[in-house]
């Protein structure tokens, strides 16, 4: 191959320009960025692995690009033959190269987005999550509310300062990229950004170029594969690193922008520092649903670690604040306090373990005296948490630390009041205000940890108790009897059980978790979430167990409804719960309900799940109103469309009217955390997007659907569910086909999360977790769970009455919920390719199932055509040239990885599959070994032929990076 005529072979750079002939906009530098990173990468590849391998990568890319041009399946076969002819080491290098190039393409795109001038799209236009054109900008939102919606500035200000967005970080599905690589990616992004800055000197340029090369090489030389599964503590540390890197500084920066935006509409005061605009919670180390690795001890560790990190972050800023507040003028209250502190601290005035202000602070610097005391207590708070974490005990008495936020805020508020009283408000509104806002947002625990547990586990505990008390089996009681017993116990005072209760491992685990909640400070925790909740007794059971385990300030109990039947029954269950007097008195007019997007989608398909979630929210809000309760909806959205993902602000703006009402909780899932908080500007945009969309939804709710639209949706949902279930649950060939046609069985090898892929080890689709279910279909680019059901539903109503097509088009144009639902599926079709799925079938599926695969692909094409008709589009994504351009740029890389994956799966599953290795032409074949062979040694324990397992995992990671969603 080395002597092949290279003139004919266009470089990848030229290929890119052929694929995307036109710039999308004036400032479109995407192709330029992409080409620069790839040129650098190919140079590195040649240096490390020789010209032959570089040419192989280019040849592979070219075949892939030819397939993308004409979709000729013969090209896939040629590509397959070329890839399978590589030896083990080379095949790992090729898979690694394409995975790496996709990561670089993502980085080029992020830099482009950060720099592109925002092209205003008309409201409601859909574009991808990461696209700069789909902003909910806080300034524009405020202006729009005042100018277009005729709201008074004061109304807007009141609504804004009373609203709360609580972002809940979860570990699953875990980011499939290792943290070691994420950090290198961040540096590549920064270098690329600086390279294209306007005022760069030739020397700067040369140094940045070298730095870029260095980081690309370092990333390529890092093992992308996690060799051991992460523990929940690892996941928690990974999640917390975003606070350190971006969120901690990002929150006060964002709140300053809100102040500025308010000023621009004529409000001359700032958002109060204690207004809970943004809150953060976490599930990492608290979510034990189906994850046996999250033990009570893990929960305790995670809370202590977060407390230590919070104290450390405050501690790292306090000396800067002491430098800033050097004033001597202060009010009487502060003067008295500073004098007291000065008198009491004379004895031990030298503190050598501090870097600044280590000697006694003179009395004419009262702010510093007071902040010096805050610093001492922060230091002790951090050290005590560290001791407890490392040894389980600490010699530092608790009273020398901060135990609640109020005592931490008090001296800071005193400084703030004093500065304002002395005419120094401008100084007070500097770093001190930022610090106060951080304390209000993050408290002493950094995040509040939610606890999540399956309802059956609580039932088991209560069953053990009732049997021990010899009053029967709780498990066998009717719902009425359960409620009656729980309420009589909750109204009484006597303890239910003593230390003599016989406990299995599972029961001890549940009770120990409640003991940890009782032992740690209240501000460590958020909600107690019950998954698979179906009845009021599920909620009352947790209330009783909290009391029995001496939880002084019980956590709010949040039922999670996720299966279709549970969503349908949720409003009635909530009404029954609110009709219990004891419970209504307990909740003080506030209730939270979580709705799950992923399991409802797996259970009934995306169409019916989306509509049922919409209706359930409307009904739940009505029930809450009836009982005078303020309801907060907690949205458990995944990162992928199949699990309820998609652009944040559009998802918020398409919720039913009155369901958000200024308080929103939403999960930010593992693989989306990096896209939301990976960098300062991303963090800023995420906070802005959630805040602006929540405000707009509350003050200018979307329209309610017309009665005829509802009737049509109800009818279509029945058909969609029928079709989905007839294939997924009733078709006898389906499970076998799914296992053969996708890498589902091999998913567990990726070590992406601490949680097992299945709730129970044996069983069919229903026991599979939603994440691997979606992941497997995403890998083959067939995306079945997202679109299955839509086609049958559209077809049914259009055949019934041809005028319905106009009704559907009217719904698409006027109703945000319907539009977002359709647009998300259209985006997934743009990322799909049934030709690739057919290749997996041909290689991996037994011949008697081929006709079934063809039937599914026919349904795919029919659904796509109907969808375009409803949206009034001739072509996929015609309304979004940005996204279309970005997907076109990636397709050739992803296709290579798909072909590589399909053939690798074939070789793993069929060891007798015959491949023809090509002869070595390069000089290296004479040598004993070449650099690529070292890669095989990274996985010495694989049960397959050398190199196969790593090649497979690299293709999985690469495809996930290319499609920008994993599970």
From Swiss-Prot:
Principal subcellular localisation of the protein: cytoplasm
Cofactor annotation: Mg(2+)
UniProt keyword terms in alphabetical order: Allosteric enzyme, Carbon dioxide fixation, Cytoplasm, Lyase, Magnesium, Phosphoprotein, Photosynthesis
An example Gene Ontology biological process: tricarboxylic acid cycle
One Pfam family here: PEPcase
Activity regulation description: By light-reversible phosphorylation.
Keyword hit for ATP-binding: no
InterPro entries the UniProt entry points to: PEP_COase, PEP_COase_bac/pln-type, PEP_COase_Lys_AS, PEPCASE_His_AS, Pyrv/PenolPyrv_kinase-like_dom
Record: active site: 172, 602
Domain of life per record: Eukaryota
Signal sequence annotation: none
GO cellular component: cytosol
Catalytic activity of the protein: oxaloacetate + phosphate = phosphoenolpyruvate + hydrogencarbonate
Subcellular location(s) per record: Cytoplasm
GO MF annotation terms: phosphoenolpyruvate carboxylase activity
EC number: 4.1.1.31
Residues where Phosphoserine is found: 11
NCBIfam families assigned to the protein according to its UniProt record, in alphabetical order: PRK00009.1
Family: Belongs to the PEPCase type 1 family.
Function according to Swiss-Prot or TrEMBL: Through the carboxylation of phosphoenolpyruvate (PEP) it forms oxaloacetate, a four-carbon dicarboxylic acid source for the tricarboxylic acid cycle.
HAMAP family cross-referenced by the UniProt entry: PEPcase_type1 (MF_00595)
Subunit structure: Homotetramer.
Record's protein name: Phosphoenolpyruvate carboxylase, housekeeping isozyme
Species of the source: Glycine max
